[in-house]
Every structure is written in structure tokens, then in C-alpha cells.
Amino acid sequence: MSCLLIVARTTSGKLCWCWNPFSTTLKTSAEMMMKMKIMWTIARATKKAYLAGMWKEMIMWLSVILSLIQGSLHWKKYVKLLQDRNGYKEKSKEKKQDPAFSFEPWRMLMHSLFIWYQIVVQMIYIC
């Protein structure tokens, strides 16, 4: 079975073309326009789906990169907080330690681990 290239002018005057894989001859111009419209719609829908998938993938990779940056920043904050906390303990042995301040490193650690967990889940979803 061979293909036939369909070239037609629409009512607005645009020149349109598409391949007709169904047959080598067309009986009427209405049939030609109908098949051309079907083919054009399929091509347009395929292109939209491809572009939507491409944008979705780009957004997912961008979110992974931003999550990596956020995770590394939180990890740096966590390390700095631990260093400050150790310095705080040495400076104020006679002072009573604030319970909220002692809880802060664990909260930061759990938040950092949650961010890294999100990164792993996103990578699994992308791949």
C-alpha cells in the first residue's frame, strides 16, 4: 500500500497538506478534506501531548535541582546550629539551657532528612 500526499486549500485560503496512508485514490474532495482534518487533529494532539510531557519533565527536573539546593542549605544550617550549640554550652555552663534551643538541631535534622527523602522520591518518579 502506498501513501498519497494530500494538498488542499482551506476555506480561509491556507494551504494544508498531509499524508494519506489509507488509500492511493480519493473519490471526492469532501473525503479528502475529512481525512485531512482527522490527520491534522491527530498531529496537533500528538504535538500538544509531546510538549506537555516535555514541560512536565523539565519542571520535575527543576524541582529536583531546587530540592537539592534547599537540602544542602538546610544541612549547612544544621551543622552551623550544632557548632553554635556546642559553643553555647561551653560559654554558659552556669546558665540554664533553653529547652527550645536544645530541640532545634533535631528539628533541623528531621527537616533535612525529609527534604532528601523528597529528592529520592522525585528521582524515582522521573526515572
UniProtKB/Swiss-Prot annotation:
The alphabetized UniProt keywords are: DNA damage
The annotated consequence of gene deletion is: Leads to sensitivity the DNA-damaging agents cisplatin and oxaliplatin, but not to mitomycin C.
Is-annotated flag, keyword DNA damage?
yes
For this entry, list what GO says about its biological process. DNA damage response
Which additional comment does the entry carry? Answer: Partially overlaps ORF YKL075C. Disruption phenotypes caused by deletion of this gene may also be a result of a defect in its overlapping gene.
Can you say what this protein is called? Putative platinum sensitivity protein 1
Its ancestry begins with: Eukaryota, Fungi, Dikarya, Ascomycota, Saccharomycotina
**Name of the encoding gene:** PSY1
